[in-house]
UniProtKB/Swiss-Prot annotation:
SUPFAM superfamilies: FAD/NAD(P)-binding domain (SSF51905). This is Prenylcysteine oxidase 1. It is found in: Lysosome. Belongs to the prenylcysteine oxidase family. It comes from Macaca fascicularis (Crab-eating macaque). Its cofactor is FAD. The gene is PCYOX1. The keyword Flavoprotein applies. The keyword Glycoprotein applies. GO terms for cellular component: lysosome. Keywords: FAD, Flavoprotein, Glycoprotein, Lysosome, Oxidoreductase, Signal. GO terms for biological process: prenylated protein catabolic process; prenylcysteine catabolic process. Residues 1-27 form the signal peptide. GO terms for molecular function: farnesylcysteine lyase activity; prenylcysteine oxidase activity. Its EC number is 1.8.3.5.
Length: 505
């Protein structure tokens, strides 16, 4: 009798251990890693995805990274007389923890973002000018806008405080299957509501004045996203956070993060243009038929193809940008119609015609950056002095009054327009591009999971387009791919994460 009881207890204990190991990812035997993964796009999203995929899947998986242009994507630079300058994403927030980690892990150096004084121009006059003295700036802001600047700072800080939860979630390997679920995990219905309301509507409801919104908020949206306060409130908050102090950049250019991540991930760079992706059944070396993805791409005039277990698309699925076709998927992959904002970056080395903005003499002008309001009727969104990516400090005072100025505009500047802005200039270079989405709430974000093992990173740009947002999306997609490959459903779309993790040491 005693022996029978002992055997029963032993059997039950064995069953309990088996069930426990099956229910716990850390105790479960992982599925063999995939043989090959394709990442399409070598901007910050694609290269950071490759980096995180390598960390999760290990050293044996082969990762191919496709890029038809230069590594770095929209983190491009422009040349002015032998010096490189940032064309697009130029500053990084001190709380962008993924970018900070990349720079540290890759051994890169940083520089503080260009300083200098800022003015706001409304088409007739400078309605606000910064002073070198902090107390003078406070007095100016309070005199013109009351305490709205302080209230705005508090509003942005509240959004940032909730947004920072993503780093804790990702450090514990939690992933989300949609942009909406990710945002809801951070800020609940408030964050989802911000996607569906304009910044103007949100801030008006919060009691901010029309003058403050026109003169302080709209110019920031114009320089950051080429749009105004009719963008969604979430991307508006992201934009306003870039008004904080402590902004920085990577010495040598922010694109060095991308090339560094490519090297660190030990990925194979394929300099070709992906034409289409098709799901096919292929017999692998195990002898079993397996569903895989055939990626067909072009290098020069030659067409090539290869098969992959997992594919991550890290380029906007916009016909003007990537033009990738998805063949024979059932159900069909959804069409993406998100319009991207056309913007033109112009770098000019010359002497600014300060009389456009002020009646003061040139030597008394003093401003390094001028932002414009919506009603300025000027043909630019902003203009500012910039340093080359190699300069650690702001440019030295010029002996001849010439600096390199970066101009953002909706349309390509004519020579006549450049001559209106400058008393004289030595050099001008222009770059028209589709820089970020055109925001028009309510926003419906594209799916992250396009098919069983086919993922899309850039849907997060419908919430906000920024270097850190792309890195967050990349980490999320890598975690999602890893957990879905291994059947770790309890690591995806978990409710109550904030409260759950808050109680952990």
């Amino acid at each position: 009798m005693g022996r029978a009881v002992a055997e029963l207890v032993s059997s039950l204990l064995g069953l309990w251990l088996l069930l426990c190991s099956c229910g716990c990812p850390e105790g479960a035997e992982l599925r063999a890693p995939p043989d090959k993964i394709a990442v399409i796009g070598a901007g910050i999203g694609g290269t950071s995805a490759a980096y995180y995929l390598r960390q999760k899947f290990g050293k044996d998986v082969k990762i191919d990274l496709f890029e038809r242009e230069e590594v770095g994507g929209r983190l491009a630079t422009m040349m002015v007389q032998g010096q490189e300058y940032e064309a697009g994403g130029s500053v990084i927030h001190p709380l962008n923890l993924h970018m900070k980690r990349f720079v540290k892990d890759l051994g890169l150096s940083t520089v503080q973002a260009s300083g200098g004084l800022l003015g706001i121009y409304n088409g007739e006059a400078l309605v606000f000018e910064e002073s070198n003295w902090f107390i003078i700036n406070v007095i100016k802001l309070v005199w013109r806008y009351g305490f709205q600047s302080l209230r705005m700072h508090m509003w942005v800080e509240d959004v940032l405080d909730k947004f920072m939860r993503i780093y804790r979630y990702q450090s514990h390997d939690y992933a989300f299957s949609s942009v909406e679920k990710l945002l809801h995990a951070l800020g609940g219905d408030d964050f989802l509501g911000m996607l569906n309301r304009t910044l103007l509507e949100t801030l008006q409801k919060a009691g901010f004045s029309e003058k403050f919104l026109n003169e302080m908020i709209a110019p920031v949206m114009r320089v950051d996203y080429g749009q105004s306060t009719d963008i969604n409130a979430f991307v508006g908050a992201v934009s306003l956070s870039c008004s904080d102090s402590g902004l920085w950049a990577v010495e040598g250019g922010n694109k060095l993060v991308c090339s560094g991540l490519l090297q660190a991930s030990k990925s194979n760079l394929i300099s070709g243009s992906v034409m289409y992706i098709e799901e096919k059944t292929k017999t692998k070396h195990t002898g079993n038929p397996t569903k895989m993805y055939e990626v067909v791409y072009q290098i020069g005039t030659e067409t090539h193809s290869d098969f992959y277990d997992i594919v991550l698309v890290a380029t906007p699925l916009n016909r003007k940008m990537s033009n990738i076709t998805f063949l024979n998927f059932d159900p069909p992959i959804e069409e993406f119609h998100q319009y991207y904002q056309h913007i033109v970056t112009t770098l000019v080395k010359g002497e600014l015609n300060t009389s456009i903005f002020s009646s003061r003499p040139i030597d008394k002008f003093g401003l390094s950056t001028v932002l414009t309001t919506d009603n300025s009727d000027l043909f630019i969104n902003s203009i500012g002095i910039v340093s080359s990516v190699r300069e650690k400090e702001d440019p030295e005072p010029s002996t001849d009054g010439t600096y390199v100025w970066k101009i953002f505009s909706q349309e390509t500047l004519t020579k006549a327009q450049i001559l209106k802005l400058f008393l004289s200039y030595d050099y001008a270079v222009k770059k028209p591009w589709l820089a970020y989405p055109h925001y028009k709430p309510p926003e419906k974000c594209p799916s992250i999971i396009l098919h069983d093992r086919l993922y899309y990173l850039n849907g997060i740009e419908c919430a906000a387009s920024a270097m850190e947002m792309s890195a967050i999306a990349a980490h999320n997609a890598a975690l999602l791919a890893y957990h879905r490959w291994n059947g770790h459903t309890d690591m995806i779309d978990q409710d109550g994460l904030y409260e759950k993790l808050k109680t952990e040491l």
